[in-house]
From Swiss-Prot:
Role, per record: Catalyzes the reduction of glutathione disulfide (GSSG) to reduced glutathione (GSH). Constitutes the major mechanism to maintain a high GSH:GSSG ratio in the cytosol.
Active site annotation, chain numbering: 459
Co-factor(s): FAD
Organismal lineage: Eukaryota, Fungi, Dikarya, Ascomycota, Saccharomycotina
Annotated binding of NADP(+), by residue: 190, 193, 196, 213, 219, 280, 327, 362
Name of the protein this chain belongs to: Glutathione reductase
Gene (name only): GLR1
Length: 470
C-alpha cells in the first residue's frame, strides 16, 4: 500500500476563511493542504457577496438613469433603465467571478499551499497516529491524506422548505444561474438576502413580490432599520406580503408558477415566472462524517467550537459559516488568520483568538443599511432602560433635493451608561456601508457620544449627522 501523504495542516473548504487560514499557515512554513469541493472563493466569491454586489450596482445604476433627467440631462430617457441586458451582463459578471477564482488559485500557489478539488470525509483507521481525510473527486477518483491538525471551513448552503412543489423554486445560488430576467418574481424570506434580491429585481424593473413571515423585514436588525426599509419597499412598489407563508407551488404547462400562500388566515394565489427561496442557511457538512468522528454539533447542526475555534476532538478546528457564528466573509478571514497565527506563528500569538463582538455589517438594500453593536431593545435589556439614551435623526439626503423621489435616511446612536458609550450605531441611507466602515473603528475603540460630538463635521454629507445629533 502506498504511503499516505501527510501534512502539518489540512484545511477542508476553499472559501475565504479556509484560504486565508491555509495561506497564513503556509507562510509560517507549515506543510499545508487545502481541499475544495466546487470553486475556490466559497459562497462570497461565487454565489454571494461579490456577484450580488455587481447586481446591486446594476440595479442602483438603473435608478440613477431614471433620475438623470431631473439632474439636468434632458436626453436621458428614464425608460433606458428598463432595457437591462440580463444575459449579456450575466456573462460579464461570471467572467469576473472566474478571474477571482484564478486569483485565489495563484495566491495559494504563491504561498506554497497544495490544493485538490473533491469532497472530504473524516476517516478513522486502526493503527493510524493522525486522523485521515478521504477525498472523492467529481470524476470518482479517491485519495487519502493525513494531517497533524485539521480545520473545517466548509461554509453553508441555502435551506429549502418542506412544502409541495418547493423544487419549482430556486435558492439564492440559483439566482446567479438565471440566464434571463424573470418579469414576475417572488422572493420568500425577509432576511438580508431576500431584501437584497428583492431590491435588485425591483430596481431592474421586474414585478417583485416579497413574502415576509413577520410585519417587517430584517427582523435581526434594530427596529428603526426594520420599519424604514419595510415602509420604503412598500412605497416603492414592491409587493411586500406581510405575515405570509407559501403553502404550495404548481408548475403550469407553459412554465408559469402558480403559488398558493396564506396571509391573514386566508389562502390566496399569485402567478409568477420565478420564485426564490431565501428562508435561511444551514451548515454544509453532508460528506464530513462528523458524528462517527465524534465532532459535536448543536441543535441546528452547526459545529460547536470554543473561543479558540477548537472542536470537541483534539487537533480538529472549525470556523466560518459551518459554525453558525457571525456568518460574514471578513469574520471568517480574520478568524482563519488568527487560528493559523496561534497554531503555527511566533509565541506572541499563542493566545490569539477572534473577538466576535461589535462586528460591522451591511445590507445592500435600496437604500443601504449599516449596523454595528447592539440594538436599542437589546441595550435596554442589557443595561436597563434608565441607563440607555438614544439619539435619532431622520432626514432627506441632499442628493434628493433635485428629485421628486425622496428616499429615506435614518440614523440612530444607542448609548449606555453615564459616559454614554456608543454601544450601537444603526444607519439607513445612501452609502451606508462605506460610512459604517470608519465609524466601526470608533465603536471598537469604545467611543462615547462626547467623542462623536468632538469631531468636526464634513459638510455637506449625510454622515455629518452622526457627529451633530443632539
Amino acid at each position: 500500500m502506498a504511503s499516505i501523504p501527510h501534512y502539518d495542516y489540512l484545511v477542508i473548504g476553499g472559501g475565504s476563511g479556509g484560504v486565508a487560514s491555509a495561506r497564513r499557515a503556509a507562510s509560517y512554513g507549515a506543510k499545508t493542504l487545502l481541499i475544495e469541493g466546487k470553486a475556490l472563493g466559497g459562497t462570497c466569491v461565487n454565489v454571494g457577496c461579490v456577484p450580488k454586489k455587481v447586481m446591486w450596482n446594476a440595479s442602483d445604476l438603473a435608478g440613477r438613469i431614471r433620475q438623470a433627467k431631473e439632474y439636468g440631462f434632458p436626453d436621458v430617457d428614464p425608460k433606458y433603465a428598463d432595457n437591462f441586458d440580463w444575459s449579456g451582463f450575466k456573462a460579464k459578471r461570471d467572467a469576473y467571478v472566474k478571474r477571482l477564482n484564478g486569483i485565489y488559485e495563484r495566491n495559494l500557489q504563491k504561498e506554497g499551499v497544495e490544493y485538490v478539488f473533491g469532497w472530504a470525509t473524516l476517516y478513522k483507521q486502526e493503527g493510524q497516529e493522525f486522523p485521515l481525510v478521504h477525498v472523492k473527486s467529481d470524476d470518482g477518483n479517491t485519495k487519502l491524506y493525513s494531517a497533524k491538525k485539521i480545520m473545517i471551513a466548509t461554509g453553508g448552503k441555502p435551506r429549502l422548505p418542506d412544502v409541495p412543489g418547493a423544487e419549482y423554486g430556486i435558492d439564492s445560488d440559483g439566482f446567479f444561474a438565471l440566464e434571463t430576467q424573470p418579469k414576475r418574481v417572488a422572493v420568500v424570506g425577509g432576511g438580508y438576502i431576500g431584501v437584497e434580491l428583492a431590491g435588485v429585481f425591483h430596481g431592474l424593473n421586474s414585478e417583485t413580490t416579497l413574502f415576509c413571515r413577520g410585519q417587517t423585514v430584517l427582523r435581526a436588525f434594530d427596529i428603526m432599520i426594520q420599519d424604514t426599509i419595510t415602509d420604503y419597499y412598500v412605497k416603492e412598489g414592491i409587493n411586500v406580503l406581510k405575515g405570509s407563508g407559501v403553502k404550495k407551488i404548481v408548475k403550469k404547462d407553459n412554465g408559469e408558477l402558480l403559488v398558493t400562500y396564506e396571509q391573514d388566515g386566508a389562502e390566496k394565489d399569485i402567478t409568477l415566472d420565478s420564485l426564490i427561496w431565501t428562508i435561511g442557511r444551514e451548515p454544509l457538512k453532508d460528506t464530513l462524517n462528523l458524528g462517527e468522528f465524534g465532532i459535536k454539533t448543536n441543535k441546528r447542526g452547526y459545529i460547536e467550537v470554543d473561543e479558540y475555534q477548537r472542536s470537541s476532538v483534539d487537533n480538529i478546528y472549525s470556523l466560518g459559516d459551518v459554525c453558525g457564528k457571525v456568518e460574514l466573509t471578513p469574520m471568517a478571514i480574520a478568524a482563519g488568520r488568527k487560528l493559523s497565527n496561534r497554531l503555527f506563528g511566533p509565541t506572541e500569538f499563542k493566545n490569539q483568538k477572534q473577538d466576535y463582538t461589535d462586528v460591522p455589517s451591511a445590507v445592500f438594500s435600496h437604500p443601504e443599511v449599516g449596523s454595528i453593536g447592539i440594538t436599542e431593545a437589546a441595550a435596554k435589556e442589557q443595561y436597563g432602560e434608565e441607563n440607555v439614551k438614544v439619539y435619532t435623526s431622520k432626514f432627506v439626503a441632499m442628493y434628493y433635493a433635485m428629485l421628486e423621489e425622496k428616499a429615506p435616511t435614518a440614523y440612530k446612536l444607542v448609548c449606555a451608561g453615564k459616559d454614554e458609550k456608543v454601544v450601537g450605531l444603526h444607519i439607513v441611507g445612501a452609502d451606508s456601508a462605506e460610512i459604517l466602515q470608519g465609524f466601526g473603528v470608533a465603536i471598537r475603540m469604545g467611543a462615547t457620544k462626547a467623542d462623536f460630538d468632538n469631531v468636526v463635521a464634513i459638510h455637506p454629507t449625510s454622515a455629518e449627522e452622526l457627529v451633530t445629533m443632539r
